[in-house]
Design a protein with these regions (language model features):
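Anion-binding (especially nucleotide phosphate/pyrophosphate-binding) glycine-rich loop
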Residues: 2-129
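Phosphate/pyrophosphate- and phosphate-bearing ligand-binding catalytic cores of soluble enzymes
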Residues: 17-18, 26, 69, 154-273, ...
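Structural signature of FAD isoalloxazine-binding scaffolds in flavoprotein oxidoreductases
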Residues: 31-32, 37-43, 70-88, 134-164, ...
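Gly/Ser/Thr-rich helix-start
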Residues: 32-33, 65-67, 76-79, 102, ...
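Short, basic and Ser/Thr-rich N-terminal targeting/leader segments
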Residues: 56, 63-65, 147, 218-219, ...
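A generic local secondary-structure boundary/capping motif
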Residues: 69, 108-111, 119-123, 136-143, ...
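Residues embedded in well-ordered beta-strands within globular domains across many folds
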Residues: 80, 120, 152, 294-295
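Hydrophobic, well-ordered secondary-structure segments
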Residues: 104, 108, 122, 126, ...
Length: 298
């Protein structure tokens, strides 16, 4: 099986690494080695890898920029594929097709520079378009579902195009959340004409707010927990006296209790233990069971 993988990589010019530390490919900077890490540069290469993995029965996982991901300390005994960044293609003046591996924050800036509204909320979000579609990423009153009109994914049955309605978007979830074997290849967004200066000012404001309120100076996976109905996870955690709570190198941020940060040398086990501690304490004191937003690579 591994011989076929190496042959495919050689034939298609795909960069293939053996034993690459996943800590270098996640924003948490945590994780042991991947047996194989593939870095395709095109959608065709990504599809070829997915098809080979399925044919050969390879245990595999697809990641973007690892911004909401916790990789195991023991690593990943299989193939990790990172989605290619590629480049957006404008289909008309307001409609753009964007590869799954493209930066959400970069797309937001690109749209604003062209005077197009609908994605300013994504300024500063460290994830990719694919991850954003999967979890219906959002902030400051905006979310992916506001502008996404379609996406194309790779499924075990072949390529499939989904309309906006077929994504079944909800808070931090989509149809992709329920079908982990559907891999987003690209999305199509329809934006609205806006005032360029106003959009750039809005983005600058969002950026300043993030820097002021979020612990961007430490590695993390963003918000550790989903927002419970009618509540804020960070506020509940703070009210339970858990700001600054620490397990090993993992800590509930003192700046924003909704974040778990890597203070240095944190392990996956540290983070998972801290998540459980926070869940248990918050549920005991408030009756609310917090649902993690961080995904664990399996």
């Amino acid at each position: 099986m591994e011989q076929q993988l190496m042959m495919l990589a050689a034939q298609q010019g795909i960069r293939l690494l053996c034993g690459a530390p996943l800590s270098h490919y996640t924003t948490f900077q945590i994780g042991g080695p991947a047996r194989w890490l593939a870095l395709p540069e095109t959608e065709a290469q990504l599809c070829a890898l997915l098809e080979l993995a399925a044919e050969q029965g390879l245990h595999f996982a697809v990641i973007g920029r690892g911004s909401d991901l916790l990789a195991p300390d023991e690593g990943f005994d299989g193939l990790v594929i990172r989605t290619p960044e590629g480049a957006p293609v404008w289909l008309d003046e307001t409609t753009v097709q964007v590869p799954a591996g493209y930066s959400l924050s970069r797309l937001s800036a690109l749209a604003a520079e062209r005077g197009l509204a609908g994605l300013t909320f994504a300024q500063g979000i460290p994830g990719t378009v694919g991850g954003g579609i999967l979890m219906n990423a959002g902030a400051y009153g905006g979310q992916i579902s506001d502008t996404l009109v379609s996406s194309v994914c790779h499924t075990p049955e072949g390529l499939r195009e989904l309309s906006a309605a077929e994504h079944d978007f909800a808070y931090r979830s989509s149809v992709y959340s329920r079908h982990p074997d559907w891999i987003v290849l690209h999305g199509v967004f329809r934006l609205q004409p806006g005032d360029r200066a106003q959009l750039l000012a809005e983005m600058a404001d969002y950026g300043a707010r993030r820097r002021e309120k979020q612990p961007l100076e430490y590695p993390s996976a963003g918000s550790a927990f989903k927002r419970p109905a009618g509540q804020f996870a960070g506020r509940l955690i703070e009210e339970c006296g858990l700001k600054g709570c620490r397990v090993g190198g993992a800590q509930v941020s003192e700046k924003h209790a909704g974040f778990i940060i890597n203070r240095g040398g944190a392990t996956c086990a540290d983070v998972l233990a801290l998540i459980r501690l926070v869940q248990e304490r918050v549920q005991a004191q408030t009756g609310v069971l917090l649902e993690p937003e961080i995904r664990v690579l399996k």
